[in-house]
């Protein structure tokens, strides 16, 4: 029975995290995998080629060798391992799971800040720092999503928790109080 994408990502992501932890390279692996993920998302054909069943293992290995130059020996070993088990079609999911494990181990949160207008990086960072401090996180990585419907303020969605500080939400609360 074939594994689901989620189960494959969980198993391989966990194995890579354990390997990095045992070699004392979790931070380096995090950094390199994040860089690799960005590159793969910018050029998805890379994964398609290395997942192509028409190419033989030798051709795939030579392509991978050309790409993995500049990465650590540990990441090269991981990439060769994934290639040998034909798991390159799950590469981004596996990286995402590794990042999830890394963030959990280091008390780093991730989330989305919905705003009516795009904030500058400094504002977003201050918001992230404030939330991280309040909820006992070492750091918080926030992505911004612009949603003019909220009128003003911010809606934070972090690790399953939603804090709605939008003007729209406040107006809805006032409307509800007035209609009682």
Swiss-Prot record:
GO MF annotation, one: proton-transporting ATP synthase activity, rotational mechanism
Membrane topology classification: Peripheral membrane protein
Gene3D superfamilies, per database record: N-terminal domain of the delta subunit of the F1F0-ATP synthase
A Pfam family matched in the record: OSCP
Entry-linked SUPFAM superfamilies: N-terminal domain of the delta subunit of the F1F0-ATP synthase
InterPro entries the UniProt entry points to: ATP_synth_OSCP/delta_N_sf (IPR026015), ATPase_OSCP/d_CS (IPR020781), ATPase_OSCP/dsu (IPR000711)
Location(s), subcellular: Cell membrane
UniProt keyword terms in alphabetical order: ATP synthesis, Cell membrane, CF(1), Hydrogen ion transport, Ion transport, Membrane, Transport
GO cellular component: plasma membrane; proton-transporting ATP synthase complex
Keyword Cell membrane: yes
Family: Belongs to the ATPase delta chain family.
Role summary: F(1)F(0) ATP synthase produces ATP from ADP in the presence of a proton or sodium gradient. F-type ATPases consist of two structural domains, F(1) containing the extramembraneous catalytic core and F(0) containing the membrane proton channel, linked together by a central stalk and a peripheral stalk. During catalysis, ATP synthesis in the catalytic domain of F(1) is coupled via a rotary mechanism of the central stalk subunits to proton translocation.
Subunit structure of this chain's protein: F-type ATPases have 2 components, F(1) - the catalytic core - and F(0) - the membrane proton channel. F(1) has five subunits: alpha(3), beta(3), gamma(1), delta(1), epsilon(1). F(0) has three main subunits: a(1), b(2) and c(10-14). The alpha and beta chains form an alternating ring which encloses part of the gamma chain. F(1) is attached to F(0) by a central stalk formed by the gamma and epsilon chains, while a peripheral stalk is formed by the delta and b chains.
PANTHER family, A to Z: ATP SYNTHASE DELTA CHAIN (PTHR11910)
Designated name of the protein: ATP synthase subunit delta
Lineage of source species: Bacteria, Bacillati, Bacillota, Bacilli, Lactobacillales
Encoding gene (name): atpH
